[in-house]
């Protein structure tokens, strides 16, 4: 069995101007839903004596980003939670890993204005945004038997923009 947690919303604002309800909504959808779905999946995986959980985070969970304190905190929290869960359930044959996308061509990145797009592209060594298939291929790998000895890790898929 395998579950992919891929919740992600943004409600951006500078921290001093951010409404607490916007903070909470992003944390609830991005981080808390990942925890709750993982908890449910782990119960099923324990019965089946194996499983894989793949949590989608974000490059900004590692780097921070202007006006996205809530989003960055939610995605960094997923990384830390995944490491803890990986430790808790490794002996039960459950692998828990993250994929941390950089800037991928999606509806979320379509909202970025053209000038900022150029700035971002200049920071990506591969000089392009990723494709959704780049993330899908990473998911397929972590869901496969080829990744059975990988646990508690984050696979960075970002064209070299962030290197851990």
Give the positions of each predicted feature.
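Active-site loop immediately N-terminal to the catalytic Tyr-X3-Lys motif
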Residues: 16, 63-69, 91-92, 127, ...
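Residue(s) in the substrate-gating loop at a strand-loop-helix junction
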Residues: 58
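Short, small/polar-rich loop/turn modules that mediate ligand/substrate recognition or access, typified
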Residues: 90, 95, 150-152, 158
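A conserved structural motif in NAD(P)-dependent oxidoreductases
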Residues: 124-135, 146
């Amino acid at each position: 069995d395998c579950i992919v947690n891929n919740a992600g919303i943004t409600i951006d604002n500078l921290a001093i101007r951010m409404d607490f309800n916007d903070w909470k909504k992003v944390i609830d959808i991005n981080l808390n839903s990942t925890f709750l779905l993982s908890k449910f999946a782990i119960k099923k995986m324990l019965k089946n004596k194996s499983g894989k959980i793949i949590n989608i985070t974000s490059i900004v969970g590692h780097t921070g980003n202007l006006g996205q304190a809530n989003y960055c905190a939610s995605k960094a929290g997923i990384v830390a939670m995944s490491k803890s869960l990986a430790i808790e359930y490794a002996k039960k044959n459950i692998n828990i890993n993250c994929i941390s996308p950089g800037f991928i061509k999606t509806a979320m990145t379509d909202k970025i204005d053209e000038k900022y797009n150029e700035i971002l592209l200049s920071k990506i060594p591969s000089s392009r945004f990723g494709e959704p298939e780049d993330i899908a291929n990473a998911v397929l790998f972590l869901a496969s038997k080829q990744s059975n000895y990988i646990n508690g890790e984050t696979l960075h898929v970002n064209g070299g923009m962030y290197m851990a």
